[in-house]
């Protein structure tokens, strides 16, 4: 089950998460929760061992809207190369704080520029505070670079590949038709 909850709620109220998590305590269902935040205190306050995923931990957008961060410009969008949502300093700072707190980190990176940024940030965090069983990962990895793959291999960073949602009924695809 892959779910995203709490999006749009003020005060970070994760209602769906609370319901699923409470039910899992009584039925043996294993739940792995990644608070969708770059605020390490969100995970620590809830005593959760992980942080990240998409939304606030997304480093770029997606191909359909041309905001996946690319090293080369999109050929069909007047030379745009997508968007990195954060500068390296912010991502590295987040990764160092989360890693030092003992949290498992997941970040969303679709484009190759975002993938490289995630790799550099996780490498910096692990150089700063080495951990053997960190289980950090970069979600999507649609265009991984050789340099980034080498960092992932050398630092044991997971690459949970997730393909685009082109034919997924829940994905609003009206923008693809324009």
Locate predicted features.
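Short, conserved secondary-structure transition motifs
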Residues: 38-42, 139-148
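Active-site-adjacent C-terminal substructures of enzyme catalytic domains
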Residues: 143-178
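Beta-strand segments within the central parallel beta-sheet cores of soluble alpha/beta enzyme folds
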Residues: 131-141
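Short, hinge-like loop/turn segments at secondary-structure boundaries
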Residues: 21-22, 123-126, 176-178
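Metal-coordinating catalytic core of metallo-dependent amide/deamination hydrolases
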Residues: 2-112, 116, 120, 151, ...
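Short, contiguous strand/loop micro-motifs
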Residues: 80-82, 134-136, 174-176
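Short helix-capping segments at alpha-helix termini
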Residues: 24-29, 125-133
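A general structural motif
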Residues: 85-87, 140, 178
């Amino acid at each position: 089950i892959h779910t995203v909850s709490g999006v749009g709620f003020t005060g970070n109220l994760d209602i769906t998460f609370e319901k699923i998590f409470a039910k899992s305590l009584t039925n043996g269902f294993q739940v792995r929760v990644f608070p969708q935040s770059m605020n390490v205190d969100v995970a620590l306050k809830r005593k959760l061992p992980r942080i990240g995923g998409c939304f606030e931990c997304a480093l770029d957008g997606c191909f359909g809207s041309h905001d996946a961060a690319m090293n080369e410009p999109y050929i069909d969008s007047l030379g745009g190369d997508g968007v990195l949502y954060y500068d390296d300093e912010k991502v590295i700072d987040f990764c160092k704080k989360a890693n030092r707190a003992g949290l498992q980190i997941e970040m969303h990176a679709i484009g190759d520029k975002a993938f490289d940024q995630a790799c550099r940030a996780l490498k910096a965090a692990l150089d700063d505070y080495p951990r053997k069983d960190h289980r950090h990962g970069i979600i999507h990895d649609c265009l991984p670079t050789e340099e980034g793959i080498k960092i992932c291999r050398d630092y044991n960073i997971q690459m949970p590949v997730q393909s685009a949602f082109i034919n997924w009924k829940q994905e609003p695809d009206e923008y693809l038709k324009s």
